[in-house]
C-alpha cells in the first residue's frame, strides 16, 4: 500500500479495500495482538533490511514492540542486517525509484524472495498467513528486487553501532553511504540542536572533511527523533 504512487487511482481503491479488510477482521475476531507478535516484528525487521529501509524503522518497531509486550533490543536490528542482505538498489542506495519497486511487485515480492528467512505462518491483516498471501506473487523485475543469491549489497540496510559516543547503541544506514566514507577520520562540528545546525550550515561554518554532530535530537530531546533532512539537504 505505501509503495502505490500518489497519482495512481489504485491508491483510492486500496483505501476502500482497507476498510473492507478491517470489517472482515472484526467479523473474524482477529485482533492486533493476533497479528503483532515477536515473529511478525522480526519479519518486519528483515524486510526493512532487505529493502534498505529507513532508520526510522528502528524507532517505530521498538515502540510497537513495547506496546505489544514484545521483548525487542536495538541490537537485534544489527544482527538481522548481518543475515539479510540488501536486495533493492533503490535511491539513495541505487538507481531505481519507488515506482520501479512498486511495479516490480513491492513488499510482497520481498517477502517471497526472502523465502525461509521469514516466519511464513504469521497471521496478517488479510486474515490469512504470510505463506497464503504469497502463493500467487511473482517478481516482475529481478533487477529491481534481487534474489537472495544476487543481492545489491551483501549486508542489510541498517547497521547498529556502539562505542564511547553511543554506549547504548546508534543507528546508521550503510547502504546509502559511499564506500569511501565507511572508514573516515576527521574533526567534529558540534551543534546543540537542529536550529543551530541550520544556522551554522547556512553561515558556511562547515569545512570539507568535518563531521556534523547535532545533539539533543533523539526520542526525548527532539522530541520524537525527527529526521535531519533539512541539514542533509543543505
Spans of features found by a protein language model:
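Catalytic or ion-coupling anion/metal-binding cores of large enzyme and transporter domains
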Residues: 1-234
Amino acid at each position: 500500500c505505501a509503495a502505490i504512487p500518489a497519482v495512481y487511482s489504485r491508491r483510492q481503491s486500496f483505501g476502500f479495500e482497507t476498510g473492507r479488510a478491517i470489517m472482515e477482521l472484526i467479523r473474524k475476531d482477529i485482533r492486533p495482538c493476533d497479528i503483532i507478535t515477536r515473529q511478525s516484528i522480526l519479519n518486519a525487521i528483515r524486510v526493512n533490511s532487505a529493502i534498505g529501509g529507513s532508520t526510522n524503522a528502528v524507532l517505530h518497531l521498538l515502540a510497537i514492540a513495547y506496546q505489544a509486550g514484545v521483548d525487542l533490543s536495538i541490537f537485534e536490528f544489527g544482527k538481522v542486517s548481518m543475515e539479510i542482505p540488501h536486495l533493492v538498489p533503490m535511491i539513495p542506495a541505487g538507481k531505481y525509484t519507488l515506482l520501479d519497486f512498486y511495479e516490480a511487485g513491492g513488499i510482497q515480492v520481498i517477502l517471497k524472495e526472502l523465502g525461509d528467512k521469514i516466519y511464513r505462518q504469521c497471521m496478517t491483516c488479510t486474515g490469512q498467513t504470510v505463506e497464503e498471501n504469497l502463493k500467487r506473487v511473482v517478481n516482475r523485475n529481478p533487477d529491481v528486487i534481487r534474489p537472495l543469491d544476487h543481492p545489491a549489497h551483501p549486508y542489510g540496510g541498517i547497521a547498529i553501532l556502539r562505542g564511547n559516543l553511543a554506549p547504548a547503541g546508534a543507528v546508521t544506514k550503510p547502504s546509502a553511504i559511499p564506500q569511501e566514507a565507511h572508514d573516515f577520520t576527521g574533526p567534529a562540528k558540534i551543534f546543540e540542536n537542529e536550529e543551530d545546525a541550520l544556522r551554522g550550515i547556512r553561515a558556511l561554518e562547515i569545512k570539507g572533511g568535518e563531521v556534523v554532530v547535532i545533539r539533543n535530537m533523539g526520542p526525548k530531546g527532539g522530541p520524537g527523533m525527527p529526521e535531519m533532512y533539512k541539514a542533509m539537504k543543505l
